[in-house]
């Protein structure tokens, strides 16, 4: 079902009903772009840590707009052993509300827009008919503005507004506005004396003049009239004054208040759908869904927090249960029988043995999708086939039980190992971001960090490390990359061999991480200095500590290419006999648990968060024997 601004309100109850009835949901988003700076390959480096990947996406992807949101609800019919689906395709756009903030600024990426256009995407449905939305802070501010306007209109008679120059008006009226206000009062007196006229339309005026009119009339005519602001076709605002008795005045005030509340709800718009999904606490399915989740939280709840641990806490408060089908398909027992985990190819593979396509049917009044037509990159369709993929894989897990189970529900313990783990694209040794605990910390003692001239290509790096057999290269930027060797003991040899190189520099991954942490500490210490000290240092550059200057230039420069050129890193006999590097295990550290999301979340989400923690404390730990088939479905701690 296609939902735009014009039919959103009349179909909202259908959306709520579908969410309430569903066993689980599948979601998908389409964006105005992916990266505003680095290329996608640089944005997704193969040796990113989860924190680094989060920071990259937060910095380079959140200024784009999620402008199409697909939602497909799935409800299992036990009588006919089939799923009933309801698909929704929402077009979303941050339309400015009633001249009030926020006036959202966003960016577009030409390649993304061109791609969507080639897929038949209708951008008019976004920019002309998109459903508005507000995050929770924007909604709070807008409601406060309305309350303030009402208090100004209804409470102008307070003594604090009495002018020392007049005993007739409790408002201080500027000299240049007194004539204007006197003319308005005179017109109202004529209206009250007239037996024929019931209404008076004033000329369009400024917001400040309207405020003076409201305050003056509220004090001078506490009864007998009703004052309302309307708007012309040209978007000019004017005031209408009507003669009414007290009962009619109260009725109109109540009517006006109800209209304002309705306008506020309209401004909140699509965010109400996200709130309903979140408050349901049900399982939300996505495919490669990290970016979808980040945009959803950022756009419809609150800006993303500064660090990953806070993001994890916030996300699990909003969506208690998430499942990523790309991670699921990349994990045993699926990994060995699914070669391609892209959504389109995964959907095709799961129709073949040993899998069985699920039996599904669209609910009455909802259009059905034909997977043969492949309406890819329509968010509603992508959400639909994401749900189908989940059902097929979940049911396949049921075949390992004794006796086999044909239908595995969204509440089954078989799929719990996949909860709240989001697939990390193109990371070689950390397959997922763990929202409910510490992330994996793989040993990277076989990885080197290499800096080199910007003229170098991938072939130059392969030539440099040709003596070390198979290598993997992950570019960081134009002048640096990670190089993964096949054997950890080769790292020491490569570093020692390159000590006197002029055009490139090699360090171990541990050294690279250590220096980055040192730079962060220096930067943090610098920012914590007083403004006075910082200003004095700006005035006198010689005051900058020598150690800081030396550290910066030592870590951020290398000799330009010389006539010596590149050389092959062939190890000598002496270097080959050097002792191996230390291969100690990196211990896992517990992530800090914060309440950073408590304030921007609703009371319902706070309660859900509390119940989830209680459940963790009260639920007995379930131990599964290593010989049990269930161990096949554990998301591994190592990759």
Curated annotation (Swiss-Prot):
Reaction(s) the record says it catalyses: Exonucleolytic cleavage of poly(A) to 5'-AMP
GO-annotated molecular function: cation binding; metal ion binding; poly(A)-specific ribonuclease activity; RNA binding
Record-linked InterPro entries: CAF1_poly(A)_ribonucleases (IPR051181), Nucleotide-bd_a/b_plait_sf (IPR012677), PARN_R3H (IPR034042), PolyA-riboNase_RNA-binding (IPR014789), R3H_dom (IPR001374), R3H_dom_sf (IPR036867), RBD_domain_sf (IPR035979), RNase_CAF1 (IPR006941)
Localisation: Nucleus; Cytoplasm; Nucleus, Nucleolus
Keyword Transmembrane attributed: no
Post-translational modification (record): Phosphorylation by MAPKAPK2, preventing GADD45A mRNA degradation after genotoxic stress.
UniProt keyword Iron, yes or no: no
Gene Ontology annotations of biological process type: box H/ACA sno(s)RNA 3'-end processing; miRNA catabolic process; nuclear-transcribed mRNA catabolic process, nonsense-mediated decay; nuclear-transcribed mRNA poly(A) tail shortening; poly(A)-dependent snoRNA 3'-end processing; priRNA 3'-end processing; siRNA 3'-end processing
Pfam families xrefs: CAF1 (PF04857), RNA_bind (PF08675)
Span of domain R3H: 178-245
Site (Interaction with poly(A)): 326
Phosphothreonine modification, residue list: 631
Cofactor: Mg(2+)
Residue list for modification N6-acetyllysine: 220, 499
Enzyme Commission designation: 3.1.13.4
SUPFAM superfamilies (UniProt xref): R3H domain, Ribonuclease H-like, RNA-binding domain, RBD
Region span, Disordered: 563-611
One GO CC term on file: cytoplasm
Main location: nucleus
Group of enzyme by EC: hydrolase
Binding partners and assembly: Homodimer. Found in a mRNA decay complex with RENT1, RENT2 and RENT3B. Interacts with KHSRP. Interacts with CELF1/CUGBP1. Interacts with ZC3HAV1 in an RNA-independent manner. Interacts with DHX36.
Job description of the protein: 3'-exoribonuclease that has a preference for poly(A) tails of mRNAs, thereby efficiently degrading poly(A) tails. Exonucleolytic degradation of the poly(A) tail is often the first step in the decay of eukaryotic mRNAs and is also used to silence certain maternal mRNAs translationally during oocyte maturation and early embryonic development. Interacts with both the 3'-end poly(A) tail and the 5'-end cap structure during degradation, the interaction with the cap structure being required for an efficient degradation of poly(A) tails.
Record-given protein name: Poly(A)-specific ribonuclease PARN
